[in-house]
Regions:
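Ferredoxin-type iron-sulfur electron-transfer modules and their immediate structural context
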Residues: 1-114, 162, 167
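Core beta-strand elements of the Rossmann-like FAD/NAD(P) dinucleotide-binding domain
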Residues: 188-190
Length: 190
């Protein structure tokens, strides 16, 4: 569900910033949910995307396809509807793309180490991004004609449009070398 700015603000205002944020324990990537909810409530969208990116490589995907166990863990869920955390995450990343806040973070401290990542699914892309950001030269090897792995070939378009994968490829191509044309030559089908 895509939220307008006002709807996102209303959902963010519902977050109680619990002493023990059960929503965070429900989140598989440990997003700092109360913080970005508050930032959306105060309409500080730039800080909200910074907080979200501090724990989540690809909110473009999780904001659309995650089953949202954070919402099941939300304290409000006891006697009311949970905060719409997944929809807030979706709104944050969409606002970040609209304002060109999703940019490559090229490391200035190069290590000189070359690393190959086999496969460009979500795990491969996240590993490549993290390794590139600490200064390694990273090449992603992909046997298919386009990057994305399960994101591209396993998730139907009505769940997540593939344009989000293509946008990321353009932005992060300065961080990560795309070697999708390379194949393993020893006969191994990876």
């Amino acid at each position: 569900l895509h939220l307008t700015d006002d709807q996102a603000k209303q959902q963010g205002a519902r977050c109680m910033d619990c002493g023990i944020p059960f929503c965070m324990t429900g989140c598989p990537v440990n997003n700092i949910i109360p913080d970005f909810n508050d930032l959306v409530y105060t309409q500080d969208w730039k800080s909200a995307i910074d907080v979200l990116h501090s724990t989540n490589n690809f909110p473009e995907f999780t904001g659309r396809i995650c089953p949202a166990p954070c919402e099941a863990a939300c304290t409000l869920n006891i006697n009311d509807d949970a905060v719409g955390i997944k929809s807030i995450e979706h709104a944050i990343i969409d606002k970040a793309w609209e304002n060109n806040w999703v940019t490559p973070q090229v490391s200035t401290n190069k290590t000189g180490k070359n690393i190959a990542i086999v496969g460009s699914g979500p795990a491969g892309l996240a590993a490549a991004q993290q390794l590139a950001r600490v200064g390694h030269n990273v090449t992603v090897l992909e046997k298919s004609d386009r990057i994305g792995g399960l994101l591209r070939y396993g998730i139907p378009d009505f769940k997540m449009e593939k344009v989000h994968i293509d946008k990321l490829k353009v932005v992060y191509s300065s961080e990560i070398q795309d070697a999708s044309s390379l194949k393993m030559t020893d006969g191994t089908n990876y």
